[in-house]
A protein has these predicted regions:
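A ligand-binding cleft/hinge motif common to bilobed small-molecule-binding domains
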Residues: 112-137
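Flexible hinge/capping segments at coil-to-helix
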Residues: 38-49, 53-76, 91
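Short beta-strand->loop
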Residues: 41-44, 135-147
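C-terminal effector-binding regulatory domain of bacterial HTH transcription factors
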Residues: 126-135, 145-211
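Beta->alpha turn/N-cap motifs
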Residues: 15, 31-34, 53-55, 124-127
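Short beta-strand-to-loop elements that line the ligand-binding cleft
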Residues: 9-13, 77, 97-107, 145
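Paired acidic/hydrophobic, glycine-rich loop segments that form the ligand-binding mouth/hinge
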Residues: 27-30, 120-124, 140-141
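Central regulatory/effector-binding core of bacterial HTH transcription factors
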Residues: 1-40, 188-190, 194, 209-211
Length: 211
């Protein structure tokens, strides 16, 4: 908005993927690997995840050494992704691990706060968990397993007659993911590739109307 001060954005945050046409949404940001075929998507970046727990939980319940050990732990799960099965890659092979626990939610921030309070183990987006990991409030687990990577996509309905404000927003998002130091640090920590763009950069959804 500082770059284009005459532009107005109506931002809505939701855990559900809504119908862009019915809701008159110009653009949605979705973290998912399952995009609707009737929509146009521009991949902005990769979203790495980390299995983590608070030191207090690990002191009370022990530290899982293998992904299969998660079955014996209280795993806090996200309603729209990985509610009962977490997907990993280990030594180049795909691995699916059944998980369960006493708390599930449709918002990952709720799960992260509960995890930091010692409620259990959760699978969190690395960019969100990084500050708590750095502060020692959370501990990264299972270093030999890479959780399934998700794509971050800008989703819209048509390339025809695209408003200049929408085009500018798309280009800005691509540039931000390509250049933001915090995002690049999280990507580097996960070994994730840089997102394409200019410069040196059931699904959560952010959606916007531009004017």
């Amino acid at each position: 908005l500082r770059r284009y001060p005459r532009t107005k954005v109506d931002l809505q945050v939701d855990s559900r993927a809504v119908n862009l046409v019915e809701q008159r949404i110009d653009l949605a940001l979705r973290i998912t690997n399952a995009l609707e075929p009737n929509l146009i998507a521009r991949r902005l970046a990769a979203c790495a995840s980390v299995v983590c727990a608070a030191p207090a939980y690990l002191a009370a319940h022990g530290t899982p050494r293998r992904a299969e050990d998660l079955a014996a732990h209280n795993c806090l799960t996200y309603n729209y992704f990985g509610k009962s099965l977490w997907q990993f890659t280990r030594a180049g092979a795909d691995l699916s691990v059944p998980v369960g626990g006493n708390l599930s939610a449709n918002e990952s921030t709720v799960l992260m706060l509960a995890t930091a309070q010692g409620a259990g183990i959760s699978l969190q987006p690395l960019f969100a968990a990084a500050p708590l990991l750095a502060a020692g409030q959370l501990v990264a687990l299972l270093p030999d397993c890479q959780p399934q990577e998700m794509g971050i996509h800008a989703v819209y309905t048509s390339r025809q007659h695209m408003a200049p404000a929408l085009r500018a927003l798309l280009d800005f998002l691509a540039e931000w993911f390509a250049c933001d130091p915090g995002w690049l640090a999280a990507s580097a920590a996960a070994g994730a590739p840089k997102a394409p763009g200019r410069g040196p950069g059931g699904a959560a959804e952010r959606r916007a109307k531009t004017a």
